């Protein structure tokens, strides 16, 4: 269970573009550069929106891109101190300090990713394309990460430069890291 005082900030907004909304226990409304981010805040970026923030305790930088919805969580009270991000839709990039040995957990509708000292990209798509597969794409840019599929309970360990798709139907699809989306579409069609 993630726990933190509702009124204490856990991150600081470092950049915004376009419309970025916040729904939380402490504040609601537009997010601006310099604003604190609180435990439990839901951040919503619009069509042209972008926001980045730095977690105060472990100096992890999180970048949230257009048309995304995330919830920011932190646990400082347990001996397993860590930050969490729940991704409901859209795309995020997480840049962890290589020296940071605390876990960062990203929860998506299809998988739970756990990383430490890693730089990675995650995108959740609920487009129901490719035989009704909704999926989450994980790419490790530097470091290592574990991804567990929520439905199947199976885990995969990823290294630098690897990309994997986790579907809500319980499958993992390994990909070459592509420069365009046609490779993703072709791999998804081959899997079915």
Segments and roles (model prediction):
Residues 4-42, 46-48, 54-192:
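Flexible, surface-exposed loop/linker segments and immediately adjacent secondary-structure boundaries
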């Amino acid at each position: 269970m993630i726990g933190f005082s509702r009124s204490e900030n856990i991150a600081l907004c470092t950049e915004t573009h376009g419309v970025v909304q916040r729904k939380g226990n402490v504040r609601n409304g537009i997010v601006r550069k310099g604003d604190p981010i609180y435990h439990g805040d839901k951040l919503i970026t619009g069509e042209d929106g972008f926001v980045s923030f730095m977690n105060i305790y472990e100096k992890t930088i999180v970048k949230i891109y257009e048309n995304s919805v995330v919830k920011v969580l932190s646990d400082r009270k347990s001996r397993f101190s860590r930050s969490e991000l729940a991704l409901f839709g859209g795309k995020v990039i997480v840049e962890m300090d290589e020296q940071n040995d605390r876990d960062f957990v990203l929860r998506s509708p299809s998988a739970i990713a756990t990383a430490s000292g890693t730089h990675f990209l995650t995108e959740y798509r609920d487009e129901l394309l490719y035989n009704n597969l909704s999926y989450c794409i994980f790419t490790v840019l530097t470091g290592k990460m574990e991804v567990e599929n929520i439905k199947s309970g199976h885990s995969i360990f990823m290294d630098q430069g690897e990309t994997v798709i986790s579907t809500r139907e319980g499958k993992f699809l390994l990909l070459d890291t592509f420069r365009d989306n046609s490779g993703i579409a072709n791999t998804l069609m081959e899997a079915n």
